[in-house]
């Protein structure tokens, strides 16, 4: 690989690099591979029926785009497949892999205007399969919708923070953008399908973006600034109201329950004749009737039992001093009232 003269010579350094993402990838030129490719390579991918109309409309643009890199593209509407091939003029050995990714993205409903960006050197793609991460369909639909958010707000915020184009389609999530952003998108998608809300990862990315602006914190640990969320999911399994104690294990089988004949043998009723059995039943019946009559009499006589009265308390009696009346004061009061009436 070599650079243009305008780019200047590359510095070959063996020293460790602090930020590998900041390194500029040298561009691959036609002069680096003057002999071209030895063999023809081709990749094909199938597309669903509902993409046929769109692909038919944009296919001339696809052919024009790959022709700039000396590739050939074919669309088979009968088989439902897209094919990209190298030609004798193709000099970039990796461009066929990039074009394969482009047709894969287009098959996953990514528009051509976005899919053609993957042909650039600093742009990659990632198709994340999420269909087998959740067993129940209801949970899968709910978590996939959580990734999109209301009116696509969550998906838009992920795109802004990672500088990637993200599309949720069926059982896959297609991401297109710089390689660092693709790692972040994959982490967010996988954690969302594992029941971690994407807003937590979005908040962490926003904090990291602000911390990057401060050069003093470049070599420090950022974990103290990032929010820590605890899982508050409580087991929703209902416990039984009355728990039965577990019986002690015994190697012997349980005892056979007593039959009616066994009970009669234990009480001696089995050996009684018919008349004796009837006499015994009559005796038991008369005992029960006597007990019921006794309870009924007690219930009837309950209304005629006089209630218990409390003894008169001594505190209610007024002392002898309070019963005395001042006669002189009463006479004076009456005379005063008579004078007022006369006047």
UniProtKB/Swiss-Prot annotation:
InterPro entries from the UniProt entry? KH_dom, KH_dom_type_1_sf, KRR1-like_KH1, KRR1-like_KH1_euk, KRR1-like_KH2, KRR1-like_KH2_euk, rRNA_assembly_KRR1
The family database entries (Pfam families) matched by this protein are listed as: KH_KRR1_1st (PF17903), KH_KRR1_2nd (PF21800)
Q: Does the keyword Ribonucleoprotein apply?
A: yes
Which residue ranges have biased composition labelled Basic and acidic residues? 272-303, 318-331
Please provide the record's keywords in A-Z order: Coiled coil, Developmental protein, Nucleus, Ribonucleoprotein, Ribosome biogenesis, RNA-binding, rRNA processing
* GO biological process annotation, one example: rRNA processing
Question: Which intervals of the chain form a coiled coil?
Answer: 272-341
Recorded protein name is: KRR1 small subunit processome component homolog
The scientific name of the source species is Drosophila virilis
């Amino acid at each position: 690989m070599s650079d243009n003269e305008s780019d200047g010579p590359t510095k070959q350094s063996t020293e460790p690099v602090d930020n590998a993402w900041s390194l500029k990838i040298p561009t691959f030129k036609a002069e680096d591979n003057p002999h071209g490719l030895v063999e023809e390579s081709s990749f094909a991918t199938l597309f669903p029926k509902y993409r046929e109309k769109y692909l038919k409309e944009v296919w001339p643009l696809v052919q024009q785009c790959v022709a700039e890199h000396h590739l050939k593209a074919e669309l088979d509407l009968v088989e439902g497949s897209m094919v990209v091939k190298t030609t004798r003029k193709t000099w970039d050995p990796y461009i066929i892999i990039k074009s394969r990714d482009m047709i894969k993205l287009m098959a996953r409903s990514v528009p051509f205007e976005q899919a053609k960006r993957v042909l650039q050197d600093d742009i990659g793609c990632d198709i994340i399969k999420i269909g087998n991460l959740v067993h129940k369909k209801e949970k899968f639909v709910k978590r996939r919708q959580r990734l999109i958010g209301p009116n696509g707000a969550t998906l838009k915020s992920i795109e802004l923070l990672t500088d990637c184009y993200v599309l949720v389609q069926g059982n896959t999530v297609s991401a297109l953008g710089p390689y660092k952003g693709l790692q972040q998108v994959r982490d967010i998608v996988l954690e969302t399908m594992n029941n971690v809300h994407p807003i937590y990862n979005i908040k962490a990315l926003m904090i990291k973006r602000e911390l990057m602006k401060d050069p003093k914190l470049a070599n420090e640990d950022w974990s103290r600034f990032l929010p820590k969320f605890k899982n508050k999911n409580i087991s929703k399994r209902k416990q039984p109201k009355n728990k039965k104690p577990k019986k002690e294990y015994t190697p012997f089988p349980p005892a056979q329950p007593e039959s009616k004949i066994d009970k009669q043998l234990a009480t001696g009723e089995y050996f009684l004749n018919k008349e004796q059995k009837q006499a015994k039943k009559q005796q038991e019946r008369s005992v029960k009737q006597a007990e019921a009559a006794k309870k009924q009499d007690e219930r009837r006589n309950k209304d005629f039992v006089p209630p218990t009265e409390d003894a008169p308390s001594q505190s209610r009696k007024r002392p002898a001093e309070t019963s005395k009346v001042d006669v002189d004061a009463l006479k004076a009061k009456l005379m005063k009232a008579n004078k007022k009436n006369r006047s």
